[in-house]
Amino acid sequence: MDLKTAVFNAARDGKLRLLTKLLASKSKEEVSSLISEKTNGATPLLMAARYGHLDMVEFLLEQCSASIEVGGSVNFDGETIEGAPPLWAASAAGHLKVVQSLLNHGASVNNTTLTNSTPLRAACFDGHLEIVKYLVEHKADLEVSNRHGHTCLMISCYKGHKEIAQYLLEKGADVNRKSVKGNTALHDCAESGSLDIMKMLLMYCAKMEKDGYGMTPLLSASVTGHTNIVDFLTHHAQTSKTERINALELLGATFVDKKRDLLGALKYWKKAMNMRYSDRTNIISKPVPQTLIMAYDYAKEVNSAEELEGLIADPDEMRMQALLIRERILGPSHPDTSYYIRYRGAVYADSGNFKRCINLWKYALDMQQSNLDPLSPMTASSLLSFAELFSFMLQDRAKGLLGTTVTFDDLMGILCKSVLEIERAIKQTQCPADPLQLNKALSIILHLICLLEKVPCTLEQDHFKKQTIYRFLKLHPRGKNNFSPLHLAVDKNTTCVGRYPVCKFPSLQVTAILIECGADVNVRDSDDNSPLHIAALNNHPDIMNLLIKSGAHFDATNLHKQTASDLLDEKEIAKNLIQPINHTTLQCLAARVIVNHRIYYKGHIPEKLETFVSLHR
């Protein structure tokens, strides 16, 4: 164990005597260097504060002049917090004496993590009331929110810490402050079921506001299934009759899909239906649908007590009612709407009803692409689920275990929607796509292409497939490390796209069809690797031969001056007879001479040849 690690471990474990011995013979500069260095992203002081070693904290500050504000990585409940200063770590862990000492030594009371979380928020999160009071007494700002606009009062409400919420309110916390998504502290109470805190907030004049999705605290409680909040708010003076009805119907839908309690759902739906007809002079009927939805098996919402009673004998119809109600009340843009459609589809798939699953998932995917930003993780999850489902169906079909077939149209439809997602992302120039999300979407598309190659098709269908792949390639999308689709097709890491296996990469079939549809075999990634380099790194001679036959330069070099043959295992070269001399032209040799002898060529040869020579740098 090196000295740096030994110092770090001693500070983390509170072994002051050991640390003193380790530093005894070191100069002031050496001590400063050892104390300021990070191990696993954290300084010794940060670890000492995290684990509450008061004597160690004071020794590091007073004897070693450790920097009191330097943040780092700390772990709480399995989550790594980045950029956490020592005061934040001590506050989150509940070490009051360490907090007091750090503040006495000049720590900034409002210093934040990378996500803009303050020490006060950290203390509020885990319910450390005494630390909350101490921080506030030392000028902690109650209104500093994290990157999501979530305040200390909001997190106290969500976590159910009533005494802390009350203290913050007494100190003047803004009860109606909104987060980035429009949530208020009332929403947090509704989502967590904290009824007592909600009542207290209302006493402090909290307003029933809608969030960014149009959700009131009452609807939030219905979505999360907190019946105590729903019962309380449906009797509140600020709640209209229509709002009460919607809340009860939505709560019933939650009982169907989240709690799996069909009788409980019927109870709330009956309450809502009775309210609709309670005033015979002003019956509140459900809106008449413009069209019936095939994915819901053309179901219609029940509109009378008699129709509601008829649902008891048909559980499947009840589940469709839940989806219809949720979509009507929450709207297609709310994440829960598409989530539970997908959930219901997955249940059908588990029971072998793949057709119903595919129909529901397609409907959810259309909803997501119409309402979410390009390359949304939710949309990517839907596309991946399709790839995993189709792979499972094809495998079982091949084993003769499955009656349902995967059609070309099913697969092709999802491929088209996947390409559409890439088009949407590339068109959004003001907000460039996240490379990791784009990489995932590209990988999913390659898996779908791989699956399509396993499905028989007509000449017309084959033309449409290649036309779509051509359109995809013309977008020139790039993933992680600036990988093109062809780079991804020859890389083994493309195999790992989700939890379940779909296709194995490198894939000769996918590589072949990409090349046939116009993929550039000499395209470069961020390290100047061509697909041939990546195929060599993955020891795949068959793909290398295909790339070379398609025009890939065998002796082209990357940023590290390596050719593909430099990267390929020598045994593979001998075994598969990939001899460099067989693929090296006189042009290539001439280009190498120019590069090796540093002959200045720019402006002296045609531009096309300049590009060719640059491949051999």
From Swiss-Prot:
Name positions with the PTM N-acetylmethionine: M1
Q: Where are the TPR repeats?
A: 245-279, 338-371
Q: Is Transmembrane a UniProt keyword of this protein?
A: no
Effect upon mutating R121A: Reduced binding to C-degron with an arginine at the C-terminus
The UniProt entry annotates ANK repeats at 2-31, 40-70, 82-111, 115-144, 148-177, 181-210, 213-242, 481-523, 527-556
Q: In which pathway does it act?
A: Protein modification; protein ubiquitination
> Mutating D77A: what's the consequence?
Reduced binding to C-degron with an arginine at the C-terminus. Abolished binding to C-degron with an arginine at the C-terminus
Q: Which UniProt keywords apply?
A: Acetylation, ANK repeat, Disease variant, Repeat, TPR repeat, Ubl conjugation pathway
Membrane-spanning parts: none
Task: Note the superkingdom of the native organism.
Answer: Eukaryota
Q: Does the keyword Repeat apply?
A: yes
Instruction: List the SMART domains hit by this protein, alphabetically.
Output: ANK (SM00248)
| Domain remarks in the Swiss-Prot or TrEMBL record | The first seven ANK repeats at the N-terminus (1-242) are essential for recognition of Lys/Arg-Xaa-Arg and -Lys/Arg-Xaa-Xaa-Arg C-degrons.
Fill in the subunit field for this protein. Component of a Cul2-RING (CRL2) E3 ubiquitin-protein ligase complex, also named ECS (Elongin BC-CUL2/5-SOCS-box protein) complex, composed of CUL2, Elongin BC (ELOB and ELOC), RBX1 and substrate-specific adapter FEM1C.
The job of this chain, per UniProt, is described as: Substrate-recognition component of a Cul2-RING (CRL2) E3 ubiquitin-protein ligase complex of the DesCEND (destruction via C-end degrons) pathway, which recognizes a C-degron located at the extreme C terminus of target proteins, leading to their ubiquitination and degradation. The C-degron recognized by the DesCEND pathway is usually a motif of less than ten residues and can be present in full-length proteins, truncated proteins or proteolytically cleaved forms.
Q: Which family does it belong to?
A: Belongs to the fem-1 family.
Its name, as the record gives it, is Protein fem-1 homolog C
